[in-house]
Amino acid sequence: MKQVFVDLRPWDKELAIAALESGAAGVIADSAGPVRELGRILVIAPDGDLIPGQDIHEITIGNTEDQARAMEAARTCRIIVHTPDWTIIPLENLVACGDNVIAVVSDIKEAEQALTVLEKGVSGVLVKTDDPDLVRSICRMVQSGISGQQLHRLTVTTVKPAGMGERVCVDTCSLMVDGEGMLVGNTSSGFFLVHAETLVNPYVAPRPFRVNAGGVHAYLQVPEGKTAYLADLKAGDRVMIVHGNGSCREATVGRVKIERRPLFLVEAESECQKVSIILQNAETIRLVRPDNSAVSVTSLKPGDVVLGRVESGGRHFGMAIDETIIEK
């Protein structure tokens, strides 16, 4: 996920509070002390978590020589880029060189452009403003998933009982809405969008903070393009909440429940690539249709179309790698 940093030079308590309350990734300040008094957040400062000029470098681009210097630095270290005459061209060149670029922005339009340049965008933005509401707006925009997820239509081919086993409920510290859930799959190259427990039913009250995600072995997509095993999740971990329209946001795990339950195997295809998932056999477990509505696994049948994500390559310790790996 993209990150938002806030410039607190000179010191501005209201901006610092806005950064903390909005979930900004960090701040840059002349001293870490005043920030620490308000709360815990990553601080870029001479006495902070990241030291300017050592862990991170600030570069002002005023000419082609500055741009060349920034492009070289972006290949090996994290840089904060100031562009007095803000245009998108220097950022395109920098983004093409690496994932270490934080762009200084002063309004929401600049932030949106920086985060989407070359479709990839910079890794983060440093908000330079005296308006706490602008900080909140940019944080909301980033957390709502400005880049989103490309979802695919999966045609169901098989739905059948899969015996008993341990399944995982992921309880987050966020409330999800209809159409939202998590991307989960049996393999690292195929995921189903498993719907959150937001719907009213005769059996149990809604649990909009929960996704009954599947077997302990399954992969879950988490931030930064990585995956995690459901069995490895714990309180405090960060996960991705994905909507059927492709938008996504991060959430914090509050609790993980692993219980033995009857299971279903669901198999599907997308452009000749097979994907599968093992879910609990219960009416309250749902996948997401292309119209963002939910369909229970107990009423799912071959030919039904649901949403998911299909990828190529494999995974090593959750990181995507360009390697031939056979999973089935």
Curated annotation (Swiss-Prot):
Keyword Acetylation: no
Catalytic activity: 2-amino-2,3,7-trideoxy-D-lyxo-hept-6-ulosonate + NAD(+) + H2O = 3-dehydroquinate + NH4(+) + NADH + H(+)
EC numbers, comma separated: 1.4.1.24
Top-level division of the source organism's lineage: Archaea
Entry GO MF terms: 3-dehydroquinate synthase activity; dehydroquinate synthase activity; NAD binding
EC class (word): oxidoreductase
Amino-acid biosynthesis as UniProt keyword: yes
Keywords from the UniProt entry: Amino-acid biosynthesis, Aromatic amino acid biosynthesis, NAD, Oxidoreductase
GO biological process, one term: amino acid biosynthetic process
Classification via HAMAP family: Arch_DHQ_synthase (MF_01244)
Annotated family: Belongs to the archaeal-type DHQ synthase family.
Reported function: Catalyzes the oxidative deamination and cyclization of 2-amino-3,7-dideoxy-D-threo-hept-6-ulosonic acid (ADH) to yield 3-dehydroquinate (DHQ), which is fed into the canonical shikimic pathway of aromatic amino acid biosynthesis.
Protein name: 3-dehydroquinate synthase
Organism field: Methanospirillum hungatei JF-1 (strain ATCC 27890 / DSM 864 / NBRC 100397 / JF-1)
Lineage: Archaea, Methanobacteriati, Methanobacteriota, Stenosarchaea group, Methanomicrobia
Gene name per UniProt: aroB'
